[in-house]
Every structure is written in C-alpha cells, then in structure tokens.
Amino acid sequence: VEFIMKKSFFIVGLLSLLTFFSCQNEENVYYSCDEAEDAWVKENLSSIRKMETTEWFSISEKLKLPVYRAFSLEQKQSVWMEKLEDVMMNNEWKTEEIEHLQQLYDALSMHSEWLIPNTEKAEEDFDAFKIFTYKWLAFAQKELGWSNDLLSAIVGTANRIKIMNGIALIEFSNGLNGVKNRSEFTCNCNSSNVIWTTCSTSNCITRSCSTTNGGCGFLGSDGCDGLCSK
C-alpha cells in the first residue's frame, strides 16, 4: 500500500510539474510586441484557431501578424497557399517565372513543417528548408532578375500583392494598395536571420522588444526582434 501511495504521489507530482512548465511555455509565447494586441490574441485563441483564411485576409491590418502567429500549422499553410495562388493567377508572369512560383507552391504543399519557426524546427527539417530557400532565392535573383522588393512582397508577407508597372504593391485589408513601409510596424524583422530578411534593401536593427513566435523572414519562419532601418 505504501508503495502504491508513493507511486501515486510521484505521478501526481510529475503531472503537476509538466502542467507548470506547459503553462510557463504558453505564457512566454509572444504574438505581438504590443501588450494589448498580445493579450487580445491570447484571450481569443480558441476562435482564432477556427478562423478561415478568407477571414484572415480581411481582418484589421495591425492584427494580421499577431493572429497569424497564433494559427495552427495547417492554417498558416492555407494562408500561404492561397496567397501564392493569388500571386500566380492575378498577375502577369513569364512562363519560367510561373514555373518558379509553382515550385515554391508545390514544395510548401508537401512541407507544412517549413512554417514552424526556425528556432523550433527539427534539425533535418531546418537543413532541408535552408537548402531549398537558398536555391530558390538564388535562381529568382540571378536567373529571373527579381529585385529584393519583389521577393519581399512574395515571400516576406502573407498579404496578397498586385504588380503594377513593375512595382509590387501589397494589398491591405482596408482596400488600399501600397509599398509597405516596414518601419511603421512594431518588430518587423529578425536581426540574426540566416536565410532571408524582410527588410529588403535595408538592415534589421535590434530594438527593445520581446521576440515574437515567427512572422518574419522567408514565409514568416523567423521570429521578430527588430525594426528595418530606413
């Protein structure tokens, strides 16, 4: 009996410890550097994780990224797949450009794990992701002549884009189009990114901000801890 009681106390204690650490981990996840936005997301997690992709595209612009960070892996994949479909269908591309975009689309359809933040990826997944992105970006820049601004509009934001006169305009949820001024947003880049910076042609400057759970870099795979310099 004494052995059974000790075993029961051990199991209860272990479960309590695991619960404590899981709560600690949840509390240490930041969906936004803005405390009010972060609190709102945490209060609405259950409804956010039922949100459809079309609804995400239409929510307030300032909440898009915090909500995206709270999405399940399947939701994130759906957002990027729809964004890439829209990029291919609603803009004019040369055949080789469409093929290159399709390559990214196909890869993402098979590798939803690539949308896990880089710091949380399994080593073999991170290695495969790095190899693919390096090759994909190199071909886009050297063979297709795509600018950093165009690449940032395609893989640096999940928002839809419209290309006019060679300039990629990002479509905002308020119906306006424009070149995104990243310095207007809180914590919009990763200062130690190893694959791709969302700053396009500028540098990411570290600032006092809690690192968020993804949302920056190539397909939002980096956390955000800084601001793009002008």
Where are these regions (language model features)?
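Positively charged n-region of N-terminal signal peptides that target proteins for export
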Residues: 2-8, 25
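Sec-dependent signal peptide hydrophobic core
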Residues: 8-16
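Intrinsically disordered, low-complexity, compositionally biased regions/tails
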Residues: 17, 149, 170, 218, ...
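N-terminal propeptides/leader regions of secreted preproproteins
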Residues: 24-184
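Secreted, short cysteine-rich peptides and small extracellular cysteine-rich domains stabilized by multiple disulfide
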Residues: 184-230
